[in-house]
UniProtKB/Swiss-Prot annotation:
Assigned EC number: 3.1.31.-
This protein's name: Staphylococcal-like nuclease CAN2
Classification via PANTHER family: EBNA2 BINDING PROTEIN P100 (PTHR12302), SERINE_THREONINE-PROTEIN KINASE 31 (PTHR12302:SF3)
Lineage: Eukaryota, Viridiplantae, Streptophyta, Embryophyta, Tracheophyta
Function statement: Enzyme that catalyzes the hydrolysis of both DNA and RNA at the 5' position of the phosphodiester bond. Possesses activity toward the single-stranded DNA, double-stranded DNA and RNA. May be involved in genomic DNA degradation during programmed cell death.
Domain of life from the UniProt record: Eukaryota
Family: Belongs to the thermonuclease family.
Length: 332
């Protein structure tokens, strides 16, 4: 069995002890999708049997279904890296079965809860060669804590004090506290170490454990420039937050900072593994183009594409604009 399928099966698809936690393919509801498909491919290679429930979703015979799984299994093994997201798995299946009936392909995707081909979006995978006009500075973040994604357009990141943009401005007392904390931990004086760490945190810094190495880092709150996602309390607010989390969670980001907003947040463009995060959010229908603060035509173009496909928040005929919602729900 290929390593990718073995890993996904072992990590994501172990049976749980309660029936309530199982999804339609014998795995937890949270893993239905990529890992469920990997689970069934794993079983198919061993038994040559396709899932029992698939026949309710497709029209073709079980013999034809077995042929699909054989092709998908081979393509999955050859993919480097193998699919890790629902979108990647959907593209692989759609490409391999492109000569089959559309109803069968969409039925197979629906069986696994994977996005249908017409809802997939293509995102540019390249960072700018030169800095756009108006950039004040840039930095590379440490991996993003999933808990730090507040909503669909705001995240908190940490930047190592070894980064040039940060290194020259670290307060002396923060550096001193970091050294003293390390010594306290060596002596197993953890109460003292915790007290010193709190002092560091209160100053806008934190000591993070990155790959078993302690890194002193500065905290930045980032507002994604040019987009406005639904607020957490709005319809589709949770989906927008989860969409951004899927893109940036546990990954390092390249941030191009244009300035600071009235709340002290850095306003910037975000790149994750070469993907322009705002582009992904707009194309997936997870945010509006914030025209009042960013006139870039390409942002309007990406929003228009999502509107035409009626994906994400655009599945609603008249979604409420975040800025209108904030105006009508101002805090006293």
């Amino acid at each position: 069995m290929g390593n990718a399928l073995t890993f996904l099966y072992g990590k994501c698809c172990k049976p749980t002890t309660t029936d309530d936690s199982l999804g339609p393919h014998g795995v937890s509801a949270a893993t239905v999708g990529v890992s469920a498909l990997a689970h069934d491919l794993f079983n198919f290679e061993i038994t040559s049997q396709v899932p029992e429930g698939l026949g309710r979703y497709v029209q073709s015979s079980r013999k034809a279904q077995a042929n699909w799984y054989r092709k998908i299994l081979e393509a999955w093994k050859q993919a480097k890296p193998p699919p890790q997201t629902a979108e990647e798995a959907s593209r692989l299946v759609t490409d391999i079965l492109k000569r089959n009936q559309k109803a069968d392909v969409e039925g197979l995707l629906s069986f696994y809860g994977l996005p249908l081909s017409h809802t997939l979006v293509e995102v540019t995978v390249e960072a700018p060669v030169s800095l756009p006009e108006g950039i004040l500075f840039e930095f590379q973040t440490l991996p993003v804590d999933p808990k730090a994604v507040a909503d669909g357009d705001t995240i908190t990141v940490y930047v190592s004090t070894s980064e040039p943009v940060v290194s020259s401005s670290v307060p002396r007392e923060v550096n001193l506290a970091a050294v003293q904390r390390a010594k306290a931990r060596e002596k197993r004086n953890y109460p003292k170490a915790d007290e010193l760490h709190q002092k560091i945190i209160d100053s806008g810094y934190r000591v993070l454990n990155i790959e078993n190495e302690e890194v002193l880092a500065r905290k930045f709150r980032i507002r994604l420039r040019g987009i406005d996602a639904p607020e957490s309390q709005m319809p589709f607010g949770k989906e927008a937050q989860e969409g951004l989390l899927k893109i940036v969670g546990r990954k390092s980001l390249k941030v191009l900072v244009y300035g600071e907003d009235q709340y002290g947040r850095c306003v910037g463009d975000l790149y994750c593994n070469g993907i322009f995060v705002q582009e992904a959010m707009l194309k997936k229908g997870l945010a509006w183009h914030y025209l009042a603060y960013d006139k870039r035509p390409v942002l309007a173009k990406w929003e228009k594409e999502a509107r035409q496909k009626r994906i994400g928040l655009w599945a609603s005929s008249n979604p409420e604009k975040p800025w209108d919602w904030r105006k009508n729900n101002r805090r006293e």
